[in-house]
């Protein structure tokens, strides 16, 4: 709307959208994290079955470096997720973007908080464990969220562009250019997130 209704440049609109939605995403992660900290493990297992029973990549409470040293696996899975969220955002626009952010925030916050809670019980220094785990895993979560956000914005632009302009309209090509740029940025962030998860997370978790 900033571009179509207010006449704002694409770069300025994208910057403001990314900043505002990133803050929203961080708020979602923190909200889910608080829920994960407050509720007992049995309740989490019952209420968040769609997260806890998704497979060993999610329901495992293992914080060993070996668990996260699988960059290609994360890259493949996150690329599939990015494509799905692009489709949802193209169809539902803002609602699709909100779903992408909420899903990603919920999955990672509940998964990681659960893993930290379980490991804190046997840790010599629970606070240090929580701090190292946060530093190790937060960069991947943030990069992944930004990747899905950029991909969703690309889908929204594309959806609005094909609705408002004919394929021969010069404005459609401007929209298409913005879509391609955002799509490349989003996939680049998926790659970067996988690299961070493969190298940074195991490195930091090695201090536990």
Feature locations, PLM:
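Hydrophobic alpha-helical transmembrane segments and adjacent short intramembrane/lumenal linkers
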Residues: 112-187, 191-192
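Alpha-helical transmembrane segments and their helix-start/interface "positive-inside/aromatic belt" motifs
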Residues: 9-27, 94-98, 176-184
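Membrane-interfacial, low-structure loops and terminal tails that flank and connect transmembrane helices
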Residues: 2-13, 169-174
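Juxtamembrane boundary at the C-terminal end of a transmembrane helix
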Residues: 192-208
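Hydrophobic alpha-helical segments and helix pairs
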Residues: 12-77
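Hydrophobic alpha-helical membrane-insertion segments
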Residues: 22-38, 91-106, 140-143, 186
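Alpha-helical transmembrane segments of multipass membrane proteins
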Residues: 82-87, 134, 191, 195
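Internal active-site segments that recognize and position negatively charged phosphoryl groups
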Residues: 64-110
